[in-house]
Amino acid sequence: MPVLRVALDLPLHRLFDYVAAEASTADIGCRVRVPFGRGERVGVIVDVAASSEWPLDQLKAAGEI
């Protein structure tokens, strides 16, 4: 499964990783709805990677791209 690196409008200077069923490098720059905390946020896809520094079973699934 591809891993999306997502930038969120937060006072944290880091990217957040989410798994996606279908994603490609063409999705870079697109907005995506992702779970964050108790709600959802809209972020921007910065990168599509094959792996993450976190175990894949700990990553949440991204929503609609």
Segments the model singles out, each with a brief description of its role:
Residues 1-65:
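Accessory, non-ATPase domains that flank or precede helicase/AAA+ motor cores in DNA-metabolism machines
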